[in-house]
């Protein structure tokens, strides 16, 4: 594992994903319909995409375009994607550019690529469409083109974003349905809003319906070991054992920033306390986990007593999902808690609002889960204490 740049690299995971995208087996050809990768916030998704997956895809000869829809909130999703595509095409046109050098084996000459359209016209009302641009790019470069759109759910909810998704779907179809195509167009959308990400691949009204959905693999114990090793050379540092640090990392939702924060607090506390690190560290982690979850848990209170009752029913059910939120038994339980009659439309309205707030998710028809397993665990732990 390379630690020279202070980044924990997940080479194996990246190489496996890259191979599945670019060299799918006959049973996994559906990746060419699009892939949607979901994972909770602050678990290292973006770092993995930019520092591991992109290089792994490029190592297999792909041309990769990465766009983060949270990079500039003042710009629309369509503007950000078009800007990234234009920039990539411009680099391919520019003699001596680093990107062009990667494809020097194509014998393009000193002038680089020459496209049959003006870059400024890309995406304009009467100009070149993304489908036309990507089709020409694949035909001339004869490579797989991978477009990664981070926080892709930002494209939902606006006419501009919806038009963008339909344009990308058209690009996928234009390239991948071409007989004997020398390369494919692969679309990878990632995001932290699990329910919306799932909807983008399963709802009939969505352009990428039928695409593959998968969960981001959170960091494991090897990351914890790497983090401990990285700071172990600091003079006078106090560290917990790997097992204790791993347990704390899990408690804090597999969030790298929280692990480092806990280790920093351990140093501060050890200066004024004789408590062994393996005893102090779990307390620090539990406190940080509780504080981090408070933001989400306070948001639940904003949905009133009925909203809290609905959330409780979901949280107390199976981690894989709860159904029957609108059934007679559930409605009776809500009524008992709120002291008034509850009708299915009220429950549906609140459930939809909590989905929009990313508090709960809908992984399947009529099935609901807590969006963040970390928040669910903190909620359950607190309610167990209240029942004692």
Describe the role of every protein-language-model region:
Residues 337-357:
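Short amphipathic alpha-helical interaction segments
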Residues 154-203, 216:
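Sensor-1/coupling segment of RecA-like P-loop NTPase cores
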Residues 1-41, 47-56:
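Walker A/P-loop-proximal flanking segment of P-loop NTPase domains
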Residues 248-250, 254-342:
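Winged-helix-like regulatory helical subdomains adjacent to P-loop NTPase cores
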Residues 33-146, 152-156, 161, 185, ...:
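P-loop NTPase nucleotide-binding core
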Residues 374-388:
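Short, amphipathic alpha-helical interaction segments positioned at domain boundaries
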Residues 363-377:
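Accessory beta->alpha helical hairpin/"wing" motif in late/C-terminal subdomains of nucleic-acid enzymes
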Residues 216-244, 251:
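Conserved small helical "lid"/interfacial subdomain of P-loop NTPases
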